[in-house]
Amino acid sequence: MQASRARLFKEYKEVQREKVADPDIQLICDDTNIFKWTALIKGPSETPYEGGVFQLAFSVPEPYPLQPPQVRFLTKIFHPNVHFKTGEICLDILKNAWSPAWTLQSVCRAIIALMAHPEPDSPLNCDSGNLLRSGDVRGFNSMAQMYTRLAAMPKKG
């Protein structure tokens, strides 16, 4: 457990240095538990998520970095690789393709890349996956933009 705490503390210091370098990601460590983190990520440009800010919850296991963190969306998102109700993310690096070389920051970058390039053939949200697999990109974009407006954009007024 000491090794994982040391690694997370190192990542925490790195995140403090990276704040200006990577304005699309804001990682925040829980004040009382270094194994709990949240992230705010900006929706990638030229996607239906553009303009949205999405909150992620990280639960880091004690054997980290030998085991991947559990990550889920707290913000509702219409995406084939994200379970609509639980926010669970289907991403290989969070499962069998994990490597200790990954950091919480690089996991956020991978999630942003997944947002820009969905994998409709391994869906956790079948409705959005079916829209993309059937070629209805317009329908998918419309739904994704609607949920981005409703859940990931600041309310006006």
UniProtKB/Swiss-Prot annotation:
Gene Ontology process terms (BP): fatty acid beta-oxidation; peroxisome organization; protein import into peroxisome matrix; protein ubiquitination
Residues at the active site: C90
Organism domain of life: Eukaryota
GO cellular component terms, A-Z: peroxisomal membrane
Pathway: Protein modification; protein ubiquitination
Enzyme class (EC, first level): transferase
Main location: membrane
Pfam families: UQ_con
Oligomeric and partner information: Interacts with PEX22.
Function: Required for peroxisome biogenesis. Necessary for the developmental elimination of obsolete peroxisome matrix proteins. May be involved in the ubiquitination of PEX5, targeting it for recycling. Accepts the ubiquitin from the E1 complex and catalyzes its covalent attachment to other proteins.
Protein's UniProt name: Protein PEROXIN-4
